[in-house]
Amino acid sequence: MTQFFYLLRWNYLRQKDLFLLFTLAQVLLSISLLFGYPLVIGEIDTTAAYYLSSGSVLIGIISIGCTISSPVIANAKSEGHVDYVRALPVPRILISLADLWMWMIAILPGVFISVILGYFRFSVRLNVSVLAVFILFLICLTMISLGFAIAYTFSPNIVTLMSQLILMIGLMFSPIMYPASRLPDWINHLYHVLPFVPSVNLLRACVYSHGPVSFFDFTILIIWILLTQLLILRVLYKEK
């Protein structure tokens, strides 16, 4: 555990200046979605309010967990930081865990502020419970793991392209800010095996008590966490 906390502290000291920027980016993105989308949609009913509130939170998580974390990690990899850490006499799995926890700490303040902004904007019902907090942690972990897996697996140029593509898919096409019933069935089937739609479904069900809690959605997130962590550990344990 001592090694883990030293790694965590080291990661924090390397990137502490980014923490405030992460929170600011999430808050500004949430404000733009919460106040901008209604200008396009027009009158907001109860269902739309829950979709916009939960969607703005998830888009903020995606923006930091996938879109920003991937280039940051890819840049650290190209600068030799990953090779240096791998050479340290610490278990490789602790390297991954320390990175994940550091980014979790960085992303959570913006998440909670985004939830509060949605509450004040639309007066939606919030479910303050252990399950709600756990689901928020799980969603953050899923998106951060996905961002890390992309950064560790691909070259920096591909990482930049994929991170932007993920945000565009999440913001423009995924049924995150609107009901999935508006899309063709075959697209819905595809989106339900990706982590984004299951995440927002669980977010609405557990944090906002809007809709049922789906074990299938929960399973999809667990599978994505396991797959992405296997990819990360494969790179960390790979001998050059």
Language-model-detected regions and their locations in the chain:
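Short hydrophobic, aromatic-rich alpha-helical segments embedded in or entering the lipid bilayer
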Residues: 1-9, 176-217
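Hydrophobic alpha-helical transmembrane segments of multi-pass membrane transport proteins
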Residues: 29, 49-118, 165, 171
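Alpha-helical transmembrane segments and their short interhelical loops
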Residues: 92, 98-161, 211-222, 226-230
